[in-house]
Amino acid sequence: MAKENQLIIQLRGFDAKHYTRTERYAKQVAKLYQTAADEFASLAGKINLPAGGTFNFDDFPKAKKQARGIVTRLAGKIEAVVTSGQRSEWLAACQKNDAFLASILRTSKLTKEEAERYQARNLEALSAFQKRKENGLNLSQRVWKYAEELKDAMELGIDVGLGEGKSAQQLSRDLRQYLNEPDRLYRRVRDKGGNLRLSKAAKMYHPGQGVYRSSAKNAQRLTRTEINMAY
């Protein structure tokens, strides 16, 4: 009985460490979004918007190209965090499995070959898991979707900020705030007016059931979900 309790405590310890690491990965993604918001603010500081004008990336080819670069880098780094976390936690799960097997091998009649088979890391299965699709989208496509949503939100935020004469520093602060509090942005866009902008904001404001209005929060949830599934 004492050995069983000791095993339970040991296995729970593996789980606790896993959840701590998973939150660390999610925080890495949050920092990537903050960096991207700062890059969008820096980009906006070089734009000369006519008085009363509306900002749209399509009207500023150079800014649009820079925005595409920001989104591409963001998506690549998020995917790297997720896949690295998946591999790390997959192997952590193997260690947990090893601990469990070690506790029963003392009294089992498994051969050495059978025990080794149970303890295999099966990285081929991990690779297949990482390449799977959900709703027709692979991991890269799902990550890209959220990164693209950030660009749309930043476009609205830049439009509002430039219209209010915000400095690059002020805009950077606002854009960072919008990452976790998108409602602030949608209210300001609504107050500013403009049917086109309201239409785009409304679409982002009602993303669908089970989906955050915040691209950053959606990406963090994706990170947690993918890594937890690998574990």
Stretches with model-predicted labels:
Residues 203-231:
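Acidic, glycine-rich two-metal-ion catalytic cores of nucleic acid-processing enzymes
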Residues 1-209:
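N-terminal leader/targeting and assembly helices and adjacent pre-domain segments
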